[in-house]
UniProtKB/Swiss-Prot annotation:
Keyword Ligase belongs to the record: no
MF annotations from Gene Ontology: deoxyhypusine synthase activity
Gene Ontology terms: cellular component: cytoplasm
Catalytic activity: [eIF5A protein]-L-lysine + spermidine = [eIF5A protein]-deoxyhypusine + propane-1,3-diamine
Pathway annotation from the record: Protein modification; eIF5A hypusination
GN (gene name): DHS
Name used for this protein in its record: Deoxyhypusine synthase
Gene3D superfamilies with a match to the protein in the record: Deoxyhypusine synthase
Purpose: Catalyzes the NAD-dependent oxidative cleavage of spermidine and the subsequent transfer of the butylamine moiety of spermidine to the epsilon-amino group of a specific lysine residue of the eIF-5A precursor protein to form the intermediate deoxyhypusine residue. Also able to produce homospermidine from putrescine.
Pfam families referenced in this protein's UniProt entry, alphabetically: DS
Similarity field: Belongs to the deoxyhypusine synthase family.
Binding-site residues, NAD(+): 112-116, 138-140, 144, 245, 292, 317-318, 351-352
Source domain of life: Eukaryota
Length: 376
């Protein structure tokens, strides 16, 4: 009995020791800093805005998406009047009406595949209503917008065999299909424009830059489904330092063989692009970047010249471990001075075709609808 009692005592002591290790006392969490995890209750009905309002408390990348919604809304809502006047500011800068008129300048960057997808229409909405001021994309982000005005892109499948598609004159972008005929139509449309641009260069001393070429193409397409048309009409800057890397480059190559002489000056554009950030004055800057690569770096690098952006939202699936710029987190850009150390930043690890429509629905489009409802 004594041995059994002693063994029982040892077991209890062991259990107490185990419990002290396993059940460490918890610190209390402040719900303001650590909100409770809770998902949307569909008993409330299928309410998109209600769902998006609740998404930040869902967890994982849904919470990152919710944080991105918050950061973009801060970009949109910011006014100079939110900050106290500095001691050395002018009388005009102290004027409340003036301070309420000074807004955040929003840069939007996106890769070409997003224009191939239905994200093109969302970009068009933002540009049509002057919700963003500076766009940066790749050559495909220019040509795909124009080509879609001439012929459609189709939804296919990721698994369609390349050799089969090649034999049928079909090009695959993920699960999207672009017929070769689309590029033939693009060539027929753009060659006379390039001829005219060369003539203006020769007879009027016009100095073409990538952004001037893009604006001209937006003017010539004259199609309200095109975001480039609206960028031209609303004087929204569109930059593409890699203008030759795509079908547009193929057209420039062919044109240079048939009718040589057209020159495009990239130096003027880098000065203009950096100036978009340098000359913002008292404004803040916000960056929204879909995907990575050139558009991401070009926007962040321009903001380095003003000691960094004030807000940054990244949406991409790239990872940081390989040292790529595409996968770099906002904190890496802070080390370069491309984003301010005090900036509001978030990266959403998600396909932008999923995340961006939801982001726009909960921010730009929601505010647009609310304004229209007030005017009705």
């Amino acid at each position: 009995m004594e041995g059994g009692a002693a063994g029982g005592q040892r077991d209890r002591e062991t259990l107490d020791a185990v419990r002290s290790v396993v059940f460490k006392p918890s610190v209390s969490l402040e719900e303001k800093r650590f909100p409770r995890v809770q998902g949307y209750d569909f008993n409330r009905g299928c309410d998109l805005i209600g769902l998006l309002d609740s998404i930040s408390s869902t967890g994982f990348q849904a919470s990152n998406l919710g944080d991105a919604i918050d950061v973009i809304n801060q970009m949109i809502d910011w006014r100079l009047s939110h900050d106290a006047p500095t001691e050395d500011c002018s009388e005009e800068e102290r004027n409340l009406a003036y301070r309420q008129s000074v807004t955040c300048k929003i840069f939007l960057g996106f890769t070409s595949n997003l224009v191939s997808s239905g994200i093109r229409e969302i970009i068009r909405f933002l540009v049509q209503h002057r919700m963003v001021e500076v766009l940066v994309t790749t050559a495909g982000g220019i040509e795909e917008d124009l080509i879609k005005c001439l012929a459609p892109t189709y939804k296919g499948d990721f698994s369609l065999p390349g050799s089969y598609l090649r034999s049928k004159g079909l090009n695959r972008i993920g699960n999207l299909l672009v017929p070769n005929d689309n590029y033939c139509k693009f060539e027929d449309w753009i060659m006379p424009i390039l001829d005219q641009m060369l003539l203006e260069q020769t007879t009027e001393n016009v100095v073409w830059t990538p952004s001037k070429v893009i604006a001209r193409l937006g003017k010539e397409i004259n199609d309200e489904s095109s975001y480039l048309y609206w960028a031209y009409k609303n004087n929204v800057s569109v930059y593409c330092p890699a203008l030759t890397d795509g079908s547009l480059g193929d057209m420039l190559y062919c044109h240079s063989v048939r009718n040589p002489g057209l020159l495009i000056d990239i130096v003027q554009d880098i000065r203009a692009m950096n100036g978009e950030a340098v000359h913002v004055g008292l404004r803040k800057t916000g960056v929204i970047i879909l995907g990575g690569g050139l558009p991401k770096h070009h926007i962040c690098n321009a903001n380095m010249f003003r000691n960094g952006a004030d807000y940054a939202v990244y949406v991409n699936t790239a990872q940081e471990f390989d040292g790529s710029d595409s996968g770099a987190e906002p904190d890496e850009a802070i080390s370069w001075g491309k984003i301010k150390g005090s900036a509001k930043t978030i990266k959403v690890h998600c396909d932008a075709t999923i995340a961006f429509p939801l982001l726009v629905a909960a921010t730009f489009a929601r505010k647009f609808q609310e304004r229209n409802n007030k005017l009705a």
